[in-house]
């Protein structure tokens, strides 16, 4: 709509690639491959897993692989680009069709499988729990309510392990989770009420 605003600023000097990935999972840094400079050898030394049919979430797949190969990520102190978000952009929520949702579900499952294969998933359980909570409620915003029992069961379990994550959730989100903890039926009724309420 032509409105300009500054993105959130993530202030750091340097950190490991895996630590930067954890910051992304915690919504403090960005997935976008194009907003970073990458050493050429990160792409050339080992083959990358590439999924040419993915049009939504390809940054996740590339960033995870590049960051796990990166010994160090360094920040620069000045703005290097402007990002224009258009109404017809691929990631705009009003254009979120079934194909993009399939991509969304794919990269979520790919991410955890890849981290497990690389032997680093145990270092990132809390970060992945936060990522899963945010993605589950994003699905609800998009009205793509599938596999909800599985998603809510995982959130309930994750909140037992990491109760501090409740601080990142809204009162409404906590009420929804509490309703699902009581029963699937009550959870669905509560969720339907909030969706209708807007």
Q: Which residues make up each language-model segment?
A:
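A structural signal for short, well-ordered beta-strand segments and their strand-loop junctions
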Residues: 74-76, 124-125
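Structural signature of alpha-solenoid helical repeat junctions
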Residues: 120, 124-128
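Donor-binding/catalytic cores of nucleotide-activated saccharide
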Residues: 1-74, 81-99
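Membrane-interface aromatic/basic loop that binds lipid-linked glycans or pyrophosphate carriers
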Residues: 142-198
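Catalytic core of nucleotide-sugar-dependent glycosyltransferases
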Residues: 78-87, 93-120, 139-142, 146-163
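Residues that form generic nucleotide/phosphate-binding pockets
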Residues: 23-24, 114, 158, 192
């Amino acid at each position: 709509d032509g409105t300009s605003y500054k993105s959130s600023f993530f202030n750091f000097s340097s950190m490991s690639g895996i630590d930067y990935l954890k910051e992304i999972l915690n919504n403090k840094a960005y997935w976008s491959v194009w907003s970073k400079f990458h050493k050429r050898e990160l792409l050339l030394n080992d083959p990358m897993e590439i999924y040419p049919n993915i049009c939504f979430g390809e940054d996740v797949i590339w960033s995870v692989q590049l960051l796990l190969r990166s010994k160090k990520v360094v920040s620069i102190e000045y703005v290097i680009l402007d990002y224009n978000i258009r109404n017809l952009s691929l990631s705009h929520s009003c254009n979120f069709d079934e194909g993009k949702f399939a991509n969304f579900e794919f990269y979520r499952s790919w991410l955890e499988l890849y981290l497990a294969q690389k032997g680093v998933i145990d270092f990132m359980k809390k970060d992945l729990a936060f990522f899963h909570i945010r993605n589950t409620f994003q699905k609800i915003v998009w009205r793509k309510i599938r596999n909800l029992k599985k998603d809510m069961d995982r959130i309930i379990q994750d909140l037992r392990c990491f109760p501090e994550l409740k601080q990142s959730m809204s009162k409404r989100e906590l009420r929804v989770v509490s309703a699902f903890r009581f029963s699937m039926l009550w959870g669905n009724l509560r969720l339907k009420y909030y969706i209708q309420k807007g």
